[in-house]
Amino acid sequence: MPKSTKPLIIFSHGNSFPGSTYGVLFQSLEARGFQIKAIEKFGHDPRYPVTSNWPNLVQQLADFASQEVEKSGQPAFLVGHSLGGFLSLMCAARHPQLGGQKVGGVLMLDSPVLGGWRAKALSVAKRARLVGSISPGAISRKRRHQWLGRDEVLAHFRSKKAFACWDEQVLRDYIDH
């Protein structure tokens, strides 16, 4: 007998967006009857170092999801944003059963899937060690990290086109976490 009747979503965040950034989304899903569990930050646990193609992060997700499935008694639906979507897909492919339950499904949100010549071009760029200079991780490493205060951070991000349409609470969660 399941320990919970609520469907279980294991959420994986995108690059530079800790799990807590998605609080508004999580609250909305919880209000609709889902359990939401998420790793707060991929790439920060020394047991799961970041390497090419993220096998350790996939294992971190599998280990986390297995524990949550065992606790809830429900199969996991793996949902991920950007990088998290890739991790979710790779996790389901490598671990179709988590915590003794078949994975319920995978949902990738804004994960740029490449195929054909684009995938081959990326593979060549990785082998030539060019990817590190143009990847989202390289871009995020160049971001400003020090501010005089929270109001300065809010003003900065509100003025950016990429953040202009963000819900106010989502922006505040992004800044706080």
State each model region's role.
Residues K3-R47:
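Conserved HGGG/HGGXW glycine-rich cap/lid loop of the alpha/beta-hydrolase fold
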Residues P7, P75, G104:
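Alpha/beta-hydrolase fold active-site loops
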Residues F11-G14, S82, S111:
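Glycine-rich His-Gly loop
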Residues V24, M90-R94:
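Active-site signature of alpha/beta-hydrolase-fold catalytic machinery across serine-
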Residues K41-V79, A93-H95, G99, V113, ...:
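Active-site loop/oxyanion-hole signature of alpha/beta-hydrolase fold enzymes
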Residues G80-G84, S88:
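Gly/Ala-rich beta-loop-alpha elbow adjacent to hydrolase catalytic centers
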Residues Q101-H145:
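Flexible "cap/lid" loop of the alpha/beta hydrolase fold
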Residues S140, R144-H177:
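Alpha/beta-hydrolase
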